[in-house]
Amino acid sequence: MRMFRITACVPSQTRIRTQRELQNTYFTKLVPYDNSFREQQRIMKMGGKIVKVELATGRPGTNAGLA
């Protein structure tokens, strides 16, 4: 099964002290090839930015650098 390893940056939902202060959350996620476009739309709708997309072959969790 073809998998994409998507690294994205999303602003956090909680406000800290002031409205101007934002916390960003970086995460890496394995996404099946078929669902990759839907995942991209979800990240963009949350106001996030996709940093990197790589092709991770094989089974989920294999050869993807995720612990």
UniProtKB/Swiss-Prot annotation:
Signal peptide: none annotated. Keywords: Antenna complex, Membrane, Photosynthesis, Phycobilisome, Thylakoid. One of its GO terms (biological process) is photosynthesis. Residues 1-56 form the CpcD-like domain. It is a peripheral membrane protein. It is found in: Cellular thylakoid membrane. GO terms for cellular component: phycobilisome; plasma membrane-derived thylakoid membrane. Pfam families: CpcD (PF01383). Belongs to the phycobilisome linker protein family. This is Phycobilisome 7.8 kDa linker polypeptide, allophycocyanin-associated, core. It comes from Synechocystis sp. (strain ATCC 27184 / PCC 6803 / Kazusa).
